[in-house]
């Protein structure tokens, strides 16, 4: 036996989580519904590798000031730098560029998968998480952007989120870029300062207008004493940006009118406002008014967005770690990124897309009781009473017969006795167990114990003698009637679950 000092400690790397069966089933249940909606809209699945050449991913990580900071990278044997993907959009751009001549244009695709960020982990902030994206490449018109917003609204409703409990919020980066140009932040030389402004605006929901004012200026001191350096804008520029964020009106038409006043005289900003007006008309035509709204506070952190940007926000309250009621907030977002594919092609390739944060949306659905997998039925467990080869073969045939009938089943393969096997079956959430000892075998019979009914009856029968005499929820059947008897038990349990859920 190894010395205790030589034992390796089992530990999970920081920022990563293990996923247990219920989480996996819940995620698959949710993603199956998302796929149904995306398929309904005519999108096709595609999958790209976890690893890409680092230069193919670009320099677009959110909240990072240095190129490719925050990416897990390594060199291969050719000394080429490779990185784990940090989102699903940059790999899609590479895929489309590499297969451009064979793909239909516009190219409509969806994909889900793991992405990785080499960032400091914290509560709710992981280094590995799953996204579910849909994108249209090759469509220059904002009808493609509007469709993304409408598809996201339909997806949330298909998942059981009621109208009024969510909003798809829409803005246009051209409008914001027009404002930034007007205050002297145009050009690549001001990229870092523009990013600071975006970060400040993105904190509007958290800190309010006055907090954003501080972040646009010299900086903000929070309650803990930590100081966040601001964007160092002059007062006139701060007022211009705050006027932009405050342009939201009672409805889309009023918001658009307010934005027109903010960007009047700036061609880029006016173009962005017109695109929002066109999208608003499409939302009304499709019956999405009230579900999708124009909101100037939506900025999205990624630098590659070039036009409309959108965010899916859940509006119901949840209790945070401090016991306070807070709005759940964003579960996904996206926008137009006309420059990503163009990097590879050397010609304009318009594109737009939407990304769902799978884990965050799962949390929301669980809070609403819309993703319950507690009724998952475990396997029927065939207990092993005799371990000689001949009898093991007999138990194995029972399992095979059940599986051929489409019934999930397993033979106990551990080394424990009857009591431990029953405990194992209980932990596996087995609906019933199959028992055949020497007496049953000689009679050509099997015992089937309904564990679900047994638990229910055990709560009603308090006297141990009565319990032993009644042998509740246990039947004996001919061996050749095993499958039919098990199916009857499973069907009865299914009816009970359906009745209880009403």
Curated annotation (Swiss-Prot):
Family named by the database record: Belongs to the class-II aminoacyl-tRNA synthetase family.
PROSITE patterns: AA_TRNA_LIGASE_II (PS50862)
Disulfide pairings: none
Reactions catalysed: tRNA(His) + L-histidine + ATP = L-histidyl-tRNA(His) + AMP + diphosphate + H(+)
Biological process according to GO: histidyl-tRNA aminoacylation
HAMAP family given in the database record: His_tRNA_synth
Alphabetical keyword list: Aminoacyl-tRNA synthetase, ATP-binding, Cytoplasm, Ligase, Nucleotide-binding, Protein biosynthesis
Enzyme Commission (EC) number: 6.1.1.21
Subcellular location: Cytoplasm
Main location: cytoplasm
Known partners and oligomeric status: Homodimer.
CDD domains registered for this protein in UniProt: HisRS-like_core, HisRS_anticodon
Gene3D superfamilies linked to this entry: Anticodon-binding domain (3.40.50.800), Bira Bifunctional Protein, Domain 2 (3.30.930.10)
Protein name as it appears in the record: Histidine--tRNA ligase
MF-aspect GO terms: ATP binding; histidine-tRNA ligase activity
GO cellular component, one term: cytoplasm
